[in-house]
Amino acid sequence: VEHLLNEANIHYPLLLSILDGDVAGRVLVDQEMPTAALVVSDYRWVYYLGNESNLSFVTEAVDFLKEDDGPLIWFGISQVLKQACHSFRAVVFLDYPRIRYLFNESAFTLPEPSVFMDAEAQISPINCANIDAAMEFSPSFHQFWNGPERFLERGFGFVMMRQRMIVSQVIAASVARGEVEVNIETIESCRGNGYASRLCYTFVQTCLDKGLLPKWDCMTENEPSKALARRLGFEELETYPVAVMQF
């Protein structure tokens, strides 16, 4: 289905990771030489590529999705596909649009170490010694990688340790085609202390050192993420549709 990728869809979070095998998923196509494809991760992230006017395939795709219980997250879903789904099945969509960012390296500068005042907080790379703790800290880790071995082989990330406890963590949610998706999490009681900023500066610099382009993407109402993106040199590129789908 590589020929169905284009500028409009190739940026969707984790799509390339599924196609590259870093994330478990399934692909449904309309014919031997596909004009349309449905891509679904095992954690129910959904992407539709290609021809949206083939209603018989859209029906097949919706039936395919209905086989599993629970909500799905559909990235890039169009009004055409929504209307088609409504005409075939009783389905509910809840919209959660996201912002896609573009990294401007010239706007990225590392702050002075003195900006971060917590001397007890220490950054450590994620490795075989702490990977289990890192995965326990972030349940979403399993959505991004097919196990710790795959992450240690293909991904990278950092944890912020304070009093021998992880308080914040940044990882490559995916590494595909020279680009890295950033995923940052901080425990609620430690937010507002600059831990996420400090980790992300380290992470972005590591991306650049590796010759990789960092990617940022967040929901439109996530103001802390938007503010952090700006500080790191990311610029808003576009808003695109995402919806939670429930049968």
What are these regions (language model features)?
Residues 1-30:
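Amide-forming acyltransferase catalytic core, primarily the GNAT-like/NAT-type
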Residues 81-92, 197, 220-238:
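Conserved active-site alpha-helix within GNAT-family acetyltransferase domains
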Residues 179, 184-198:
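Conserved glycine-rich acetyl-CoA-binding loop
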